[in-house]
């Protein structure tokens, strides 16, 4: 199991990055809540990882903090939630937001996440409720403030943001509407994704 990587970021294309660790480039999928906090291309970063082994692929998922990975692991234990859906959930909400939604039984908020239907949302509430009690007292689930690093280059922020939403499970028409709704001149793709996800909840 690969649990942690430290190296230089050589590519960033939400929600994926490539990190060079001693000459080996690891492709890593990240939830957007972690992607926002990556340093710029060419800079070094530490990410916590979870390896998913399938018949047709080995997928490496990365997280800015341990508590994000902890929640990811809890999510994929839930019946009907695979790694890609867990990634979409963690992209739409921070650990603290998700914990609050579960503890307060906010079913509607959970069903707004792409791929989460009513049954899955109900299952999440049943299986995860109680696991987040006293989240303020445990540093496993404490929301830390990060510095947001702005990308130094911009191919086409809207297009990149749209592609990231598609990768997270949104339909093309929905993704385009979401980006159009929050688009502002000079915004990076990461800002557009963050605003689009925030506005959709």
Curated annotation (Swiss-Prot):
Q: Which organism is it from?
A: Haemophilus ducreyi (strain 35000HP / ATCC 700724)
Subunit (UniProt) = Homotetramer. Forms an RuvA(8)-RuvB(12)-Holliday junction (HJ) complex. HJ DNA is sandwiched between 2 RuvA tetramers; dsDNA enters through RuvA and exits via RuvB. An RuvB hexamer assembles on each DNA strand where it exits the tetramer. Each RuvB hexamer is contacted by two RuvA subunits (via domain III) on 2 adjacent RuvB subunits; this complex drives branch migration. In the full resolvosome a probable DNA-RuvA(4)-RuvB(12)-RuvC(2) complex forms which resolves the HJ.
The annotated region (Domain II) lies at 65-143
GO terms of molecular function = ATP binding; four-way junction DNA binding; four-way junction helicase activity
User: Domain text from the record?
Assistant: Has three domains with a flexible linker between the domains II and III and assumes an 'L' shape. Domain III is highly mobile and contacts RuvB.
The record's listing under Gene3D superfamilies reads:
5' to 3' exonuclease, C-terminal subdomain, DNA helicase RuvA subunit, C-terminal domain, Nucleic acid-binding proteins
Which family does the record assign?
Answer: Belongs to the RuvA family.
What is the annotated localization of this protein? Cytoplasm
Annotated region Domain I: where? 1-64
Task: Tell me the GO BP annotations in alphabetical order.
Answer: DNA recombination; DNA repair
Q: Which GO terms describe its cellular component?
A: cytoplasm; Holliday junction helicase complex; Holliday junction resolvase complex
Name of the protein described by the UniProt record: Holliday junction branch migration complex subunit RuvA
**What exactly does this protein do?**
The RuvA-RuvB-RuvC complex processes Holliday junction (HJ) DNA during genetic recombination and DNA repair, while the RuvA-RuvB complex plays an important role in the rescue of blocked DNA replication forks via replication fork reversal (RFR). RuvA specifically binds to HJ cruciform DNA, conferring on it an open structure. The RuvB hexamer acts as an ATP-dependent pump, pulling dsDNA into and through the RuvAB complex. HJ branch migration allows RuvC to scan DNA until it finds its consensus sequence, where it cleaves and resolves the cruciform DNA.
> Region Domain III: which residues?
154-201
Stretches the record annotates as Flexible linker? 144-154
Principal localization reads cytoplasm
Keywords on record = Cytoplasm, DNA damage, DNA recombination, DNA repair, DNA-binding
Q: Does the keyword DNA damage apply?
A: yes
Q: Which domain of life is it from?
A: Bacteria
Short name of any one Pfam family annotated for the protein: HHH_5
């Amino acid at each position: 199991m690969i649990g942690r990587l430290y190296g230089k970021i050589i590519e960033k294309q939400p929600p994926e990055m490539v990190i060079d660790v001693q000459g080996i480039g690891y492709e890593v999928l990240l939830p957007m809540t972690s992607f926002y906090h990556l340093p710029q291309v060419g800079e070094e970063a530490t990410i916590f990882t979870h390896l998913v082994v399938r018949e047709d692929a080995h997928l490496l998922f990365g997280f800015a903090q341990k508590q994000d990975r902890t929640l990811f692991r809890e999510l994929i234990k839930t019946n009907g939630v695979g790694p890609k859906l867990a990634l979409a959930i963690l992209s739409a909400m921070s650990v603290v937001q998700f914990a609050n939604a579960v503890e307060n039984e906010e079913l509607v908020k959970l069903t707004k996440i792409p791929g989460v239907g009513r049954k899955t949302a109900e299952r999440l509430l049943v299986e995860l409720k109680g696991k987040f009690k006293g989240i303020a007292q445990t540093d496993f689930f404490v929301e830390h403030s990060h510095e947001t690093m702005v990308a130094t280059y911009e191919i086409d922020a809207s297009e990149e943001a749209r592609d990231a939403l598609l990768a997270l499970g949104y339909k093309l028409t929905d993704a385009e509407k979401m980006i159009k709704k929050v688009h502002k001149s000079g915004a990076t793709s990461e800002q557009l994704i963050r605003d689009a996800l925030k506005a959709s909840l």
